[in-house]
């Protein structure tokens, strides 16, 4: 009886660890998606003004980044 209980506890621990890792990966992905919210945005037109100058800078050359441009 004790062997079965020990085996059950071991299996439950392994399943719990797998579940916790899965949840942690989902939260990490959600966190990185939220942090990625500041990623450069496409300009309306290359070499034109950014759609949101306060957030992305005054001038675009491919992709808008805060106060600088990057060709993309």
Swiss-Prot record:
UniProt keyword terms in alphabetical order: Disulfide bond, Knottin, Secreted, Signal
Main location: secreted
Subcellular location: Secreted
Signal peptide (from-to): 1-24
Domain of life: Eukaryota
Cellular component per GO, a single term: extracellular region
Statement: the UniProt record of this protein carries the keyword Secreted: yes
Tissues/organs with expression: Expressed by the venom gland.
Keyword Membrane: no
Disulfide bond entries: 43-61, 50-64, 60-69
Propeptide: 25-41
Entry text on domains: The presence of a 'disulfide through disulfide knot' structurally defines this protein as a knottin.
Annotated protein name in UniProt: U1-sicaritoxin-Sdo1a
Species of origin: Hexophthalma dolichocephala
């Amino acid at each position: 009886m004790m062997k079965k209980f020990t085996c059950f506890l071991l299996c439950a621990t392994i399943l719990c660890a797998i579940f916790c890792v899965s949840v942690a990966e989902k939260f990490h992905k959600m966190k990185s998606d939220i942090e990625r919210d500041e990623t450069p945005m496409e300009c309306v037109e290359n070499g034109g003004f950014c759609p949101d100058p306060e957030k992305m800078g005054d001038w675009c050359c491919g992709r808008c980044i805060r106060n600088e441009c990057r060709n993309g």
